[in-house]
Amino acid sequence: ISTGDIFRANLKNGTDLGKQAQSFMDRGELVPDSVTNEMVRDRLGNSDAANGFLLDGFPRNTNQAQVLDQILADKKMPLDAVLELKIDNAEIIKRLSGRRACRGCGGTSHVEFEKPKIVGVCDKCQGALYQREDDKEEVIARRLEIYAEQTEPIITFYNSKAVSYTHLRAHET
């Protein structure tokens, strides 16, 4: 379950939480915890999460980790493991800034790794491809700064708990 997907679904559906998140996402800033936590709580209430789930992009700070602990306690579910995928910042920027989304079907391609047959045109539906605001290089760079400031401390948080914590090099993924 990706927080990015949760945000985009809330935006597409015009929810109050989605509207609150929009301006932060466009600037590459983290959506405030109060909004993010509520979106995640709502999403984890769906039936497909009843027997377990894998979260992508959450928690991003110790406050969110504490809220996740409470959500799991309310659901009477354990936290089985934490995985951290590490990759060089230059590679992150290259991968994200080259990503293109389709205005028609929502599919994605990449200017280098998954080139469409016709530049700027989706292979699936022939819709127009565009670069999302949060995939622009300057926005990605800001997101990486925020990651270093706010997300890295949760490594300490989870290392202090009896939770399996695994660090994986993700450069070949």
Question: What is the meaning of each model-derived region?
Answer:
Residues I1, A81-L83, Y165:
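Hydrophobic/aromatic beta-strand patches that form the interior of the parallel beta-sheet core
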Residues I1-M77, D88-E91, A101, R132:
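ATP-dependent small-molecule kinase phosphotransfer cores
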Residues S23-F24, A73-E149:
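A glycine- and Lys/Arg-enriched "phosphate-lid" helix/loop adjacent to the NTP-binding pocket
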Residues N51-G52, V163-Y165:
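Residue-level preference for the first positions of well-ordered beta-strands
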Residues R100, E152, A162-V163:
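S-adenosyl-L-methionine-dependent methyltransferase catalytic core, i.e., the SAM/SAH-binding region
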Residues Y158:
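Major-groove DNA-recognition helix of helix-turn-helix-type DNA-binding domains
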Residues T166-T173:
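Conserved small/polar residues in nucleotide/adenosyl-binding loops
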